[in-house]
Amino acid sequence: MICGIDEVGRGCIFGPILSAAVVFKKKPSFIKELDDSKKLKKEKREYLSSLILKNSYYAFAEISNITIEKINIHNASLLAMQTAYENLKLNCSLVLVDGKFVPKITAKNVKAIIKGDSIIDEIKAASIIAKVKRDKLMDEYDKIYPLYLLKKNKGYPTKEHKNAIKKYGVLSLHRKNFKLI
């Protein structure tokens, strides 16, 4: 069994970092449609996410902005990937994570793959379901904090988001150790 893991929200200034772990039940028919979530249009991501969720074992992990502030974004990213794998509750023969660094995962064989979200199908799938889940979370936060345009910026430090912080202040879900805040 091969597990792919990726995280989203690393470059954000609002909300959690979110990670997903994916193991395909069998080789999916839509495998050629998979790509790095950042390269796909929203509609395609959501369509593929629904297919991935139906055809795989998966788990998520969220690391809060408070924890990010305590342990830094790098360690929070690794913790998110580790926790997503632990939440999967499967013993995989190979775990492939996107990036340069290997989280503390208790599998026999764990490898970090630079640009893995563009190369490895399981990581592509993890990238897609993680992004769709985090984007939906930002859409929900936008209903609570509409002045920050979270539905549009998804927590990233856009000009409009930074202007909203200047005008309305920092929220409890903002990552206060980022230089922009």
From Swiss-Prot:
The record's listing under Pfam families reads: RNase_HII
What stretch or stretches form a coiled coil here?
Answer: none
Does the record's keyword annotation contain tRNA processing? Answer: no
What remark does the entry make about the cofactor? Manganese or magnesium. Binds 1 divalent metal ion per monomer in the absence of substrate. May bind a second metal ion after substrate binding.
Annotated Gene Ontology cellular component terms: cytoplasm; ribonuclease H2 complex
- The residue ranges of the RNase H type-2 domain are 1-181
Instruction: Please indicate if the UniProt record lists Metal-binding as a keyword.
Output: yes
The EC number of this protein is 3.1.26.4
Q: What class of enzyme is it?
A: hydrolase
> Where does this polypeptide localize?
Cytoplasm
Q: What is the catalytic activity of this protein?
A: Endonucleolytic cleavage to 5'-phosphomonoester
BP term (GO), one: DNA replication, removal of RNA primer
Q: Which cofactor does it need?
A: Mn(2+); Mg(2+)
Report the sequence similarity comment from the record: Belongs to the RNase HII family.
Q: Give the function comment from the record.
A: Endonuclease that specifically degrades the RNA of RNA-DNA hybrids.
Protein name, entry field: Ribonuclease HII
